[in-house]
Amino acid sequence: MAETTKIFESHLVKQALKDSVLKLNPVYMIKNPIMFVVEVGMLLALGLTIYPDLFHQESVSRLYVFSIFIILLLTLVFANFSEALAEGRGKAQANALRQTQTEMKARRIKQDGSYEMIDASDLKKGDIVRVETGEQIPNDGKVIKGLATVDESAITGESAPVIKESGGDFDNVIGGTSVASDWLEVEITSEPGHSFLDKMIGLVEGATRKKTPNEIALFTLLMTLTIIFLVVILTMYPLAKFLNFNLSIAMLIALAVCLIPTTIGGLLSAIGIAGMDRVTQFNILAKSGRSVETCGDVNVLILDKTGTITYGNRMADAFIPVKSSSFERLVKAAYESSIADDTPEGRSIVKLAYKQHIDLLQEVGEYIPFTAETRMSGVKFTTREVYKGAPNSMVKRVKEAGGHIPVDLDALVKGVSKKGGTPLVVLEDNEILGVIYLKDVIKDGLVERFRELREMGIETVMCTGDNELTAATIAKEAGVDRFVAECKPEDKINVIREEQAKGHIVAMTGDGTNDAPALAEANVGLAMNSGTMSAKEAANLIDLDSNPTKLMEVVLIGKQLLMTRGSLTTFSIANDIAKYFAILPAMFMAAMPAMNHLNIMHLHSPESAVLSALIFNALIIVLLIPIAMKGVKFKGASTQTILMKNMLVYGLGGMIVPFIGIKLIDLIIQLFV
């Protein structure tokens, strides 16, 4: 699922070519009125090729009319090819998912406690099944008994198994995943054909994809332009009669196709499908295309601190000795107290100790694990003891043993806390040696990412349960714009509503049942696949890898989708305007000599001008397919900067490219005339 599919893989291209021909069916083509106009023109050109006197006009060269027919046919095939290729990529992903839905048996538990083996497809909602090591979970369900590790790699692409148990936030299992160890009893929660995987396949294939509001608005604009250009073309016929100029039906057909926005009309559907495809490449399930587009309008991101901005594991950052001890002695004691500590904090202390270039000898001793009661861990050697733990617990231990508390210890502990860190006090026997500074580490690359989002006009808000001082320290280090300290789940809803009241589009992440109301309230809610079912139902995006930082990726994909559609629309309309001024002077120059002043391209003849424009019109669709599929590339910048850049590249470029392309094609046509 997480693998990236190349745009022009041979098997996808072959299937897309077949599908692009099948899509020529008028019943299908009428769904895209712009391209349907092209198909009507193609059929009229075919009719004029077979019956030159079809409209009782002066006969026109059959070769010329047939050339128009072929070019229009290729235009339709190319437009259909872009859509078929985008759909093919989705189907390829769906097939990969469908491979996990192999025929399997289920061990259903009967009311008397005995088992019966049945086909998984016969399971109904409410049935209870037992799944043991190496077996696949037959359908979506809820763990009601047992504890096991479950391999979800077939669905999420994540190789590390996850622990599932009854109760809490980790009792939901997905059909098609397998039990890696132990056993589970699962209550089926979905009917056959309506599982999470079935819905995922349907969404990836685009079967339930509907046009988004932005697509509908753009489509309305394109249809309006199409009608306007068709009216212009129809008025040309009586104008030509008045000027005693022979304007054939074939030329009118070709001219109409050249001027209506066929480029974006042929690529519009592919852009939308490809946008959904890019989201699935990140292992994110979008419930609708609208949710992806909404991401493009997001201007406020609400992010949890733990797991999203920070790694969530406190890491050793510094050793700070008290005045009565030495740095070397503190490092050795911290190392000894942590060498058998397999927690992330313990491993980070050992790693930091190695970096101090001090001789660290390992003695044999009895490891004392951390408990909630003692709040410390350490090692008992034959002649001494070494511990590390919470300041209060360590001070209490020393006092009870009649030891001495260093006068500067309190200042060291408070200093670490003010920086947003967690202090651990280290002692040897009953002597306090110093403090280990544990720091909640900011994830790599986030500072740059937040800067990029800020340049794009997106505000980041960090929500954390930490106190004001700790929250301020981490917010400053990470580079977020604002923070909400001592934030409870219900406070997130208030933050979302406040931002929405200002007219902002808000996105947030969550995974627990208590996050569900906020996920539903936000304009874009990204739920973790490892989270509760209520969170996943409330959200409109689900991250199969359960990585909260992906919300930023989805926002960028949404912006890229909107930019791609806008850029190619600008390019297409600019193309149409350029073709208008490139073709008309060449066509009417004989009847209206004054038009010669506008004939800056000096095309060979009216016929070659029309054919050149038609060929360019068809080829430009093919050339723009990679951009439609991959999206317009952009770097973090303000909306105004991006708009100006795209207007320059796709607006001005859309005006210049047709003049160059049509002239080159005209020169090639002259070689064969």
Curated annotation (Swiss-Prot):
Please give the Gene3D superfamilies that the UniProt record associates with this protein: Calcium-transporting ATPase, cytoplasmic domain N (3.40.1110.10), Calcium-transporting ATPase, cytoplasmic transduction domain A (2.70.150.10), HAD superfamily/HAD-like (3.40.50.1000)
TM helices/strands, residue ranges: 34-54, 65-85, 216-236, 253-273, 581-601, 609-629, 649-669
Broadest EC class?
Answer: translocase
EC number, as in UniProt: 7.2.2.6
Q: Which residues form the active site?
A: 304
In the bilayer, the protein is annotated as: Multi-pass membrane protein
Q: What are the GO cellular component annotations?
A: plasma membrane
Which residues are involved in binding Mg(2+)? 511, 515
Instruction: Identify the residues that bind ATP.
Output: 341, 345, 370-377, 388
List where in the cell it is found.
Cell membrane
Q: What is its main location?
A: membrane
Query: What catalytic activity does the UniProt entry give for this protein?
Result: K(+)(out) + ATP + H2O = K(+)(in) + ADP + phosphate + H(+)
- What are the alphabetically sorted keywords of the record? ATP-binding, Cell membrane, Ion transport, Magnesium, Membrane, Metal-binding, Nucleotide-binding, Phosphoprotein, Potassium, Potassium transport, Translocase, Transmembrane, Transmembrane helix, Transport
In alphabetical order, the GO MF annotations are: ATP binding; ATP hydrolysis activity; magnesium ion binding; P-type potassium transmembrane transporter activity
Report which residue ranges the record marks as coiled coil.
none
Q: How does it assemble?
A: The system is composed of three essential subunits: KdpA, KdpB and KdpC.
**What does the similarity note say?**
Belongs to the cation transport ATPase (P-type) (TC 3.A.3) family. Type IA subfamily.
Cited function: Part of the high-affinity ATP-driven potassium transport (or Kdp) system, which catalyzes the hydrolysis of ATP coupled with the electrogenic transport of potassium into the cytoplasm. This subunit is responsible for energy coupling to the transport system and for the release of the potassium ions to the cytoplasm.
Tell me the protein's name. Potassium-transporting ATPase ATP-binding subunit
Q: Which organism is it from?
A: Staphylococcus haemolyticus (strain JCSC1435)
Q: Which gene encodes it?
A: kdpB
